[in-house]
Structures are given as structure tokens and as C-alpha cells.
UniProtKB/Swiss-Prot annotation:
Disruption phenotype: Long circadian-period phenotype under free-running conditions. GO terms for cellular component: nuclear lumen; spliceosomal complex. Identified in the spliceosome C complex. Interacts with ILP1. The keyword Nucleus applies. The gene is STIPL1. This is Septin and tuftelin-interacting protein 1 homolog 1. Residues 200-245 form the G-patch domain. Residues 354-401 form a coiled coil. A motif (Nuclear localization signal) lies at residues 60-75, 156-186. It comes from Arabidopsis thaliana (Mouse-ear cress). It comes from the Eukaryota. Pfam families: G-patch (PF01585), GCFC (PF07842), TIP_N (PF12457). The keyword Nucleus applies. Residues 1-118, 167-193 are annotated as: Disordered.
Length: 849
């Protein structure tokens, strides 16, 4: 029965306090007079504050007053909900909520205190006739009325006996726990309540395991719950259906097991420290020590994590838009709601304050670093300005010295004592001592202005064609003083050196080139240009070539006559090819026209034509050279081969040598075609008849190899020539073997039949091209016959067609439509070659008038 000793029994033991029985009626000893109803009672009803406790008298009133005083002195726990006193006996096997258990414990302690106060009150009051016990009439030692006389019958006696037994048990218990009724401290409940369950719980599981239970829910399909339903504390003043409150749900089995393990460890810890914990329950709980983070630690932590990129983040997930400065606590509110953290609004506000403080610390640190960087940059700028100031001071001192030196040079120039050597030495000293100031102040221009009169005096009357080295050393020494080193191209006209050469050297070269230089003798001018190659600026060199050399060459070519000239034209034109290059292309048309006029009357026996034409093979373009050979040289060589006779007995090789001399000049395909058509048929026919006459093979073999050596290397390397020579060798081998020698014409016909159709078409097209002339070629031939100049006009086009000059008339050749157009009165009209000749003659007569 010890387990029910702290619980209140539901009985009638305390129903007859404060009165007595008289007969069959219960009479109160101190009956209060009924209090009159006041205005507040009428207004507030049961909600009015009552002062009936102050009006109570007697033992009951004094007990309620003392109880009220004690209750007023005890601080109420406002965080706990309203609890109701149970009217029945609570069985120990029922689960008791933590808050209700604490409330019942407090109630039991209050009852014990009330009984103590009653005993103390009884002992203090003095009565009559009992002495030191202080008991009055009608009261026993326990402060109650004499219930033996008041309670009637067996029922009353039984109730009184039970009350005495309970009172006696309470007194004994207080004596054991507190050491007496007076001055003893009330003991708290033991900390080992429920420890016995450790040895009793789990027996059911053991029995089930012995019967084959392996865990899981009960039932056929294991649909039963495994973990017990946990009771959840409903918030204070919350009704049953308020705000969709969620009732208890099945907890996770893993969490339940973890919770059981934690509960056992805690209970064991409490048991091991039971004595010390029981004594220290009255002490204040230990407060968690606050951890402070300094600004340096915060900045160091942020620096390790990395500061944000300065991006503004706007959170629009909730009902209100907010700006987020820290992503760490972005979901803190949702997590707090899920974890049921108390006072989430307060924690949110504190978190905002902490974030703002962190942001402010970071801003202050950022401003501090910016200020430090600004101070550092200002310090560097200060040092730079100091250095610039010193540099400017030195520059000013240098400028003063340079100005004084220039003044002294001016005085010497005015007095006439200044020479090129002394002037060069002074400016060389200035350039060496003050290189930056020399460039900045453009002292090269001042030096050029002072040296120019002296150079003009030196080169006065100079002939560059006869004395190319005159003044070369002086110009070379002044080039370094006058050129601009910053510019990659130091030979521009704007440099002082280019100006000096243009005003000193160029006039002398122009005068000598125009007046005394003969283009047919290019050596003097070439020698001068080679000597001054490294000293002449590019602008001056181009001026000499364009204004002196090229006009003189053009005039000489126009007046050149191959019939009267003793010196070949390539002798005095080709040396200018590396220097002039493409600028000579317009002269090639004139040279071709003049050569064509001479080649009309040329005979293959005249070797001078080869001497004049062969050097131009690499100069003219391939098409122009082939047309020239096809039109003027190849026909004459074909006639020479037709007249050539192959006679082993008395062979004359004069005409054959005429043809072989042109083997390196005439294109190889034209030469091979000419030999196949006009030489090898005769040669093979003579060999065939000779082999039929049964000659000596040694003579024929010597004759064959003798002819083979007469062919130049250009022909023997050609496949077509080798085939013809092999045919003769095959005929010779047939005769040696005693086989009948086949006729060369039959083999030629057989070879012609074996040639593919495509090759025959190409050969036919080539033969046709040799016979048919284009409209341009016809006009060229007509201009040569009339001794008129026919050449294209550079950079002049009309409707995408090149404009040519036929004498004094502009002509367009439309090769597609085979039309010839001439310009007349601002328009283009169809004309014939005779019309062009008439128009040229008319323009010539008009010009003479």
C-alpha cells in the first residue's frame, strides 16, 4: 500500500470537520453569519473578488487564511496550463503527464504543510485544565473534536478510527523524514521513482520471442502498430477542435528505440547521482555560458567562407517581398516551425539583428580596407609626384643648358666660323648627354636647319654619275643625328634626314640624269644607286626612279629600232628589272610590237634574232611568249625542216642546226610537234630503205647514235621525241634479228589508231588554235603592219572590258560577241580595223593643225 500513500482517497473522512453531531443533526461550532450582497456582487456575480477569507473565524478560518498567505508567497508558474484536481484514485499503470504529475506532487506537499501548520497551531494555543498540552475543552491531542461522542453508530466509529490511523501514520512519516514536527524540512519526492520498471519491463517481449515472435506489427499481415502512441501536450487554453490541431500519430520505430536508450541512460545517471541531486534540487539551474564572437573572428570566418559577390537577393516566396543579405539563415523560419521552436518570432527578430550587425561589421571592414588602399594609392601618387617634380627640375636644368649651347652655336654661325664637323660634334655631345631631351625638343630639326646651308655649299656643282662617293662620309655621319628612332620607318619624308637628302642630293641627281645620262649606258646611274643604297631614304629613291630613270627608259624604248641598233635592247633594259620590277610592264608591249615588225622579214639563217629574243623568254609572260613564237618563229623553222634532206651519203646539217638552235627558246610542245611532222618521217623512211638494202649494221648503228647526239637535251627529255627515236631503234633490231622490217608509215597509222579519242580531240583543238587567230590578235597584226602602237591602258575599264590604245584611238574588244568598239564623241560605236586607221589619221591631222 506504500505506492498509494501520496494519493488522496475518495472517501467521507474529511466531510465532518468544523462541527459536531447532536442527536441526528450536525451542528457547526462556529457558524458564519451570512454576508450581505454588495453592488460588486450584483455586477460581477461569480467573477467578483471575495474577501470572505478575512471574515472567517475559528479554526477553519485561520487555516484558510494561513493557506492563502502561503499561496500568495509562492510564485506561480505562468508557463503551465490550467490543471484540474482529479477526484478519483489514479492507478500506477496509467500514463501520467509530466505537468499533471508535478501538480499532484505540489498538492501533496501543500497538504502536508497544512497538517504541520495545524499541529503547530494546536500546540501554541493554551487551553483550560490540561496544562502544558494546551488542549481546551472538547478537543483531543490532534486538534480535532471528540468524534467518539459526536459520530453515531458503528459507521461513525469506523470512520473515526480510520481517520485516527491516517493521522498517526502521517505523524510517524513526518518524524522519520523531517526529524520531528517542529522546524523540520519537508523532503522532496525520491529521484528513483519508476526505477523498478527497469527490471519488470521487457518480460512480455521475452515471452513473445520464445513463442517465435520476431518483431513487427501484430496480425496476419503485420498491420498492427509497433511503437506506442505518444501523448502530445496540447497548448494552453486550446480547445479540442482549435486551429486543426494534429493529434498524436504513430512515431518512427527508430526514434522510439533511440528515445528508450536515451531514457535509460538518463535514469541511470540520475540514480548514480541521486543523493547529490536530491540535495541540490533547491538550487538554481546552471545557466549556459554565453559565447561571444569578436569582430576579428567574424571577419576571419567570413573571409575563409568567402564574402558574397555583392549581389542583391530578393526572397519572394512569402506573402511579403524581402531582401536577403545572408543565405545561411534563409530557411530558418521554416525549420523553426517544423521543429516547434518556442517563440519563433523573437528568434527571427534576433536573427535579423545579428545579420544586420554582421553586415554592418563587414561594411565597416570593407570601408576600412578601402581607406587603407586609398591611403596607399595616395602615398604612391605622392612619391610619383615627387619623382616627377625631380624629373621636371632636371629637365628644366637640361633645357637651360641646351638653350645656352644653341645660342653659342648661333653665334658661331653668324660669325661664319661654323663647320659641319664642329656642328656634328656638338650635337653628338647633346644627343649622348641628354637623349630624352634631344628627342623631346626635336634638336634634330634644329641641327638640320643649321647644317643644310653647309651641305648645299658642299654639294654645289656635284656630278653623281661621275663621282658617286662625293660627300658620302659626311651624309653617313649626320644620319644618326637627324633620323627619328621612335619610328620604325626612319626613311619617311617628314624626318629631318629625308629633308636634308631631298634638298641636297636629289637636285644633283635629277640634273645629271636628265641632262647627261644615256639609258643605253645604265652603268653610271646603277653605280650611283648601288653606292647610295643604304643612305637614300625610300621616298628619295622612288622619286629618282619615277622622275629620272623610268621616263628616260620609256623614251629610249620608243626610239629603239632593232634594224639599226647594234646593242641588244635587253642589255640596257634587263639591269633595271630588280629595281623597277612591274613598272617596266608597259614597256614590254612596245618591245613586242617592235620585235614583231622585225620578225616578219626574218630568215632562220639569221642568228641575231635568237640573240635578241631568247633573253626575253623569262621576262614576258608565258602566253605572250608562246604567241610570239607560234606566229613568227615556228612557221619559219617548219619551212627550214621541209627543205632539209636526210642523206647518209652526203649529209648537210645546216638547216637542222638552224632549228636546233631554237630548241631552248621555242616551247617544247611546239618543238616536238614540228619534229614529228617535218623531220622524223623523212628520217625513218631513209632508215627503212637503208635496212632493206642489207647494209653493214655497224655503219647504221653509228649513223643512228650520231643523229641522237645532235638533239639537244630539251628534246631528248621529251616523251614524244624518245618514242620516235625508239621506233628507229626497233627497225634496226628487226633487221639484226632477220625479221622483215615494217614500213614506218604503217606503224605511224597504227599508232594514230591506238591514240584515244580524247587525245586526238586535244591535238585537233591545238592544230585549230594554231590556225585561227582571235580578234585581238588580228588587231595586233593590223597595228604592226601600219606601224602603230597597240597596248592596254592601265587601270581603265568599261563594262568590265579592258580599254586598249590603237594609236590615238581608244578601243574595246568584245571577244564573246566578236565586236570591236571605238570611243568617239563620248560614246562607243562598232568599227572595223580600217575605220580605226581612218580615225587615227584624222586625230593626227587635227593635232598638227
Amino acid at each position: 500500500m506504500d505506492e498509494y500513500q501520496d494519493m488522496e482517497r475518495f472517501s467521507m473522512d474529511n466531510d465532518y470537520e468544523g462541527g459536531r453531531w447532536e442527536g441526528d443533526e450536525f451542528v457547526y461550532q462556529k457558524r458564519k453569519e451570512k454576508r450581505k450582497q454588495t453592488k460588486n456582487d450584483a455586477t460581477y456575480g461569480i467573477f467578483a473578488e471575495s474577501d470572505s477569507d478575512s471574515d472567517d473565524s475559528g479554526g477553519g478560518g485561520s487555516r484558510r487564511k494561513r493557506r492563502k498567505d502561503r499561496d500568495s508567497g509562492r510564485k506561480a508558474d505562468l508557463t503551465k496550463p490550467v490543471n484540474f484536481v482529479s477526484t478519483g484514485t489514479v492507478m500506477p499503470n496509467q500514463e501520467i503527464d509530466k505537468d499533471s504529475r508535478e501538480h499532484n506532487d505540489e498538492k501533496d506537499r501543500d497538504k502536508i504543510e497544512d497538517n504541520d501548520m495545524i499541529d503547530e497551531d494546536v500546540e501554541v494555543r493554551g487551553g483550560l485544565g490540561i496544562g502544558s498540552s494546551g488542549l481546551g475543552l472538547g478537543f483531543n491531542a490532534n486538534g480535532f473534536d471528540d468524534e467518539d461522542n459526536l459520530l453515531p453508530g458503528a459507521l461513525g466509529k469506523k470512520i473515526a478510527d480510520r481517520a485516527k490511523m491516517r493521522g498517526k501514520a502521517k505523524v510517524e512519516k513526518r518524524g522519520q523524514e523531517g526529524g520531528g514536527a517542529k522546524g523540520g524540512k519537508k523532503n522532496t519526492l525520491g529521484s528513483d521513482i519508476g526505477q523498478f520498471e527497469k527490471s519488470t519491463k521487457g518480460i512480455g517481449m521475452k515471452l513473445l520471442e520464445k513463442m517465435g515472435y520476431k518483431g513487427g506489427g501484430l496480425g496476419k499481415n503485420q498491420q498492427g502498430i509497433v511503437a506506442p502512441i505518444e501523448a502530445q501536450l496540447r497548448p494552453k487554453n486550446m480547445g479540442m477542435g482549435y486551429n486543426d490541431f494534429k493529434e498524436a500519430k504513430l512515431p518512427d520505430l527508430k526514434k522510439v528505440e533511440e528515445k528508450k536508450i536515451i531514457g535509460v541512460s538518463v535514469s541511470e545517471n540520475e540514480q548514480s547521482h541521486g543523493d547529490r541531486g536530491g540535495k541540490n534540487l533547491w538550487k538554481k539551474k546552471k545557466v549556459r555560458k554565453a559565447v561571444y564572437v569578436t569582430a576579428e573572428e567574424l571577419l576571419e570566418k567570413k573571409q575563409e567562407a568567402g564574402f558574397g559577390g555583392g549581389q542583391t537577393i530578393i526572397d519572394m516566396r512569402g506573402p511579403q517581398v524581402r531582401v536577403v543579405t545572408n543565405l545561411e539563415n534563409l530557411d530558418a523560419e521554416e525549420k523553426a516551425k517544423e521543429a516547434d521552436v518556442p517563440m519563433p518570432e523573437l528568434q527571427h527578430n534576433l536573427r535579423l539583428i545579428v545579420d544586420l550587425v554582421e553586415h554592418e561589421i563587414q561594411k565597416i571592414d570593407r570601408d576600412l580596407r578601402n581607406e587603407r588602399e586609398s591611403a596607399l594609392s595616395l602615398q604612391q601618387e605622392k612619391e610619383m609626384l615627387i619623382n616627377e617634380e625631380e624629373k621636371q627640375k632636371r629637365h628644366l636644368e637640361n633645357m637651360e643648358y641646351i638653350a645656352d649651347e644653341i645660342s653659342r652655336i648661333e653665334l658661331e654661325n653668324t660669325s661664319g666660323n661654323l663647320t659641319l664637323d664642329s656642328l656634328a660634334i656638338r650635337f653628338e655631345d647633346l644627343q649622348t648627354s641628354y637623349p630624352d631631351d634631344y628627342k623631346l625638343c626635336s634638336l634634330s630639326t634644329i641641327a638640320c636647319s643649321l647644317a643644310l646651308p653647309l651641305f648645299i655649299r658642299m654639294f654645289q656643282g656635284w656630278d653623281p654619275l661621275s663621282d658617286a662617293v662625293h660627300g658620302l662620309k659626311a651624309i653617313s655621319s649626320w644620319r644618326k643625328l637627324l633620323e627619328v628612332e621612335e619610328d620604325h620607318n626612319i626613311w619617311v619624308v617628314s624626318t629631318p634626314y629625308s629633308q636634308l637628302v631631298s634638298e641636297v642630293v636629289l637636285p644633283a641627281v635629277r640634273i645629271a640624269g636628265i641632262n647627261t645620262w644615256e639609258p643605253r649606258d645604265p652603268e653610271p646611274m646603277l653605280r650611283f644607286l648601288e653606292t647610295w643604297e643604304t643612305l637614300l631614304p625610300s621616298s628619295v629613291l622612288q622619286t629618282i626612279l619615277d622622275t629620272v630613270v623610268l621616263p628616260k627608259l620609256s623614251t629610249a624604248v620608243e626610239y629603239w629600232d632593232p634594224r639599226r641598233e647594234l646593242v641588244a635592247i635587253h642589255v640596257w633594259v634587263h639591269p633595271w628589272l630588280p629595281i623597277l620590277g612591274q613598272k617596266l610592264e608597259f614597256l614590254y608591249q612596245i618591245i613586242q610590237m617592235k620585235l614583231s615588225n622585225v620578225l616578219d622579214a626574218w630568215h632562220p639563217s639569221d642568228s641575231s634574232a635568237y640573240t635578241i629574243l631568247s633573253p626575253w623568254k623569262t621576262v614576258f609572260d608565258t602566253t605572250s611568249w608562246e604567241q610570239l613564237m607560234r606566229r613568227y618563229i615556228v612557221p619559219k623553222l617548219q619551212l627550214a625542216l621541209q627543205e632539209f634532206q636526210v642523206n647518209p651519203a652526203n649529209q648537210n646539217l645546216e638547216r637542222f642546226d638552224w632549228v636546233m638552235k631554237w630548241a631552248s627558246a621555242v616551247p617544247i610542245h611546239l618543238m616536238a610537234d614540228m619534229m614529228e611532222r617535218f623531220f622524223f618521217p623523212k628520217w625513218l623512211d631513209v632508215l627503212y630503205h637503208w635496212l632493206r638494202a642489207k647494209p653493214r649494221f655497224e655503219e647504221i648503228q653509228g649513223w643512228y647514235y650520231g643523229w641522237k647526239e645532235l638533239f639537244p637535251q630539251e628534246l631528248t627529255a621529251n616523251e614524244r621525241i624518245r618514242i620516235q627515236l625508239k621506233r628507229g631503234l626497233d627497225m634496226l633490231m628487226e633487221a639484226v634479228e632477220g625479221v622483215e622490217v615494217s614500213q614506218p608509215r604503217a606503224k605511224a597509222n597504227e599508232r594514230t589508231q591506238s591514240v584515244p579519242a580524247q587525245a586526238q580531240a586535244q591535238a585537233k583543238a591545238q592544230m585549230d588554235s594554231t590556225e585561227v587567230l582571235s580578234l585581238k590578235e588580228v588587231l595586233e597584226v593590223f597595228a604592226q603592219e601600219q606601224e602603230l602602237l597597240f597596248k592596254p591602258k592601265p587601270n581603265r575599264m568599261h563594262n568590265g572590258l579592258q580599254i586598249y590604245g590603237f594609236g590615238n584611238v581608244s578601243v574595246i574588244i568584245d571577244s564573246v560577241n566578236q565586236k570591236l568598239l571605238a570611243q568617239k564623241d563620248g560614246g562607243w560605236f562598232l568599227v572595223t580595223p580600217d575605220d580605226l586607221l581612218r580615225m587615227h589619221n584624222n586625230t593626227t591631222v587635227s593635232a598638227k593643225r
